[in-house]
């Protein structure tokens, strides 16, 4: 799964993948548009937790003025 949100100056991306051990990982990447600065954070979650966490993050992005691009 890949989701991307943007505001006028910032971006926020979520990747959900399976790692080499078979665990689900949720990686969040964020930063400024046109800027090399940014950061990322990785979380290991169960399948049930992934859906809830993605929805929680999407709700936060919308509340903060981001628009979903992908």
Regions found by a protein language model. Give the residues of each.
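Negatively charged, low-complexity tracts enriched in Asp/Glu with abundant Ser/Thr
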Residues: 1-8, 35-36, 47
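Generic alpha-helical secondary structure signal
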Residues: 6, 15-16, 48, 70
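Alpha-helical structural elements
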Residues: 6-7, 25, 61
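Short aromatic-glycine-(Arg/Gly/Cys) micro-motifs in beta-strand/loop hairpins
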Residues: 15-41, 55-56
């Amino acid at each position: 799964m890949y989701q991307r949100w943007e505001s006028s100056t910032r971006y926020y991306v979520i990747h959900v993948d399976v790692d080499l051990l078979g665990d689900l990982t949720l990686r969040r990447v964020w930063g400024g548009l046109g800027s090399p600065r940014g950061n990322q954070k990785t979380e290991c979650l169960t399948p049930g937790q992934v859906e809830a966490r993605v929805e929680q993050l999407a709700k936060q992005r919308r509340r903060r003025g981001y628009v979903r691009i992908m």
